[in-house]
Swiss-Prot record:
InterPro entries: FabA_FabZ (IPR013114), FabZ (IPR010084), HotDog_dom_sf (IPR029069)
Organism ancestry: Bacteria, Pseudomonadati, Pseudomonadota, Gammaproteobacteria, Enterobacterales
Top-rank taxon: Bacteria
UniProt PTM comment: The N-terminus is blocked.
Protein name: 3-hydroxyacyl-[acyl-carrier-protein] dehydratase FabZ
HAMAP family, per database record: FabZ
Length: 151
């Protein structure tokens, strides 16, 4: 456990990510170290709009949105590690490998996303990500993002 903890509240997250409700999936950053790792939280509420159809009577947080939450966490880590983008630049979600879903996420859960920087090569940055609920893995994946000018 580090003694020099860095946290980010929602106001700071909104300065870094372009996402907004209902697609902002990071509520708070619990800890990070630039260029190394980030731990963030998503509080899963029954009021999420997608629960109306996924699934009526048995609400389950969509797996693709777990991946998106981890991708947003990697975006925050990238911004905090290499700085804000220049005008006309974006971080694009460029790929995902080895995604595995271990158990469902349901309303009332607090999902912790842990992402770690792996490497940058040819303009692509690779991260490992894991999402946990109550200390148990619900999803894991390798994700890539690319910094690029808007098309």
């Amino acid at each position: 456990m580090t003694t020099n903890t860095h946290t980010l509240q929602i106001e700071e997250i909104l300065e870094l990510l372009p996402h907004r409700f209902p697609f902002l999936l990071v509520d708070r950053v619990l800890d990070f170290e630039e260029g190394r790792f980030l731990r963030a939280v998503k509080n899963v509420s029954v009021n999420e709009p997608f629960f109306q159809g996924h699934f009526p009577g048995k609400p389950i947080f969509p797996g693709v949105l777990i991946l998106e939450a981890m991708a947003q966490a990697t975006g925050i880590l990238a911004f905090k590690s290499v700085g804000k983008l220049e005008p006309g630049e974006l971080y694009y979600f460029a790929g995902i490998d080895e995604a595995r879903f271990k158990r469902p996420v349901v309303p009332g859960d607090q999902m912790i996303m842990e992402v770690t920087f792996e490497k940058t090569r040819r303009g692509l940055t690779r991260f490992k990500g894991v999402a946990l609920v109550d200390g148990k893995v619900v999803c894991e994946a390798t994700m890539m993002c690319a910094r690029s000018r808007e098309a």
